[in-house]
């Protein structure tokens, strides 16, 4: 009987909501006592997100969705950092969520169901007071990796000694527990270089320490060093390595162009195995004209087949590409807009991935055994790139500290060199490591695997043993 309810509070963005929904699916499939209620906060311009939830809800039995009323006065992004804006948005929603929780807890239990605890996105840590008022445990679901968590732990403890923002161009090297190598300050999340973003992240870092536990979208196979570090931290919340939280048969991205998707997949079907490099820079990775031209020149130089998911903020692709480019690469290259990233990475023709290093994208590429070329753009992606290249030896370095707002132009020669390195099949150590990790993490999610066991432990801790 499903009589144990968990309240899930995700950040209302696709990149955070999708793994949240998949984690809900895992819990429901793994334990027949659990049902889940999602509280969905409302932002402007999220109709695509509402449609996605409506589409996927039919495939999630024992999950219900409750809309949090829209704020009468919404925080505005203005000159704020994104992190500061999101923190303000979540904090402003706390009273609305509190009212919903009071209603749930005061209503007669339906079918004997008891609310057992909260699971909230790390941006939603201000909701911890709602859980405390209800005398319920509060767990954080971190859609990123344990390296990021180690950095946040460092930030929480370091804040007591130093309350100043980091310098973007600093050559400082940080000794962060959980990392093997010194971490360059320049690869820290971009928010930490801006005063209000720094303040928001420090507040989140301190709130992490007050949670009952932290569920992380990673596994011991991917990040043994940082996860072993947390095993020895008696005064820090329990860390559960429950990843990879990823469904290779998931519903399409809500912004996906289905016609373009079909065309891309048909083109891949005609290509030899592991012969295509896929380039995609995420939902916010729009590129400027000069950079588009350098990428195009780099693709011409390297001579490998390519599929390029190109999104720009300027005019049309034809106006940005070098004159005659499509004619010169005819037959070995294709450009599309929105692409079905999961399906593309799963395709046997794809042998490499030039990525912005969002953690969801990294998880997908590792799952399918596709090695990455690192080209971070924003948020914590620079730290992810450093983690993948220097700590884990699972990626080829193009850039580690690139920022989409820097104005830096990456040269065609640099691009050609990195792509040639990742696509080279002779003595490719990174490719072999990635393929080995792929097999290991797929085993980890099955009964008897480490991630499956971590979910079991979380269920035991929040719900208890079966009676």
Curated annotation (Swiss-Prot):
Keywords: Glycosyltransferase, Transferase. Transmembrane segments: none annotated. CDD domains: GT1_Gtf-like. The keyword Glycosyltransferase applies. SUPFAM superfamilies: UDP-Glycosyltransferase/glycogen phosphorylase. Pfam families: UDPGT. It comes from the Eukaryota. Gene3D superfamilies: Glycogen Phosphorylase B (3.40.50.2000). UDP-alpha-D-glucose binds at residues 283, 339-341, 356-364, 378-381. GO terms for molecular function: UDP-glucosyltransferase activity. Its EC number is 2.4.1.-. PANTHER family: GLYCOSYLTRANSFERASE. Belongs to the UDP-glycosyltransferase family. This is UDP-glycosyltransferase 71D2. The gene is UGT71D2.
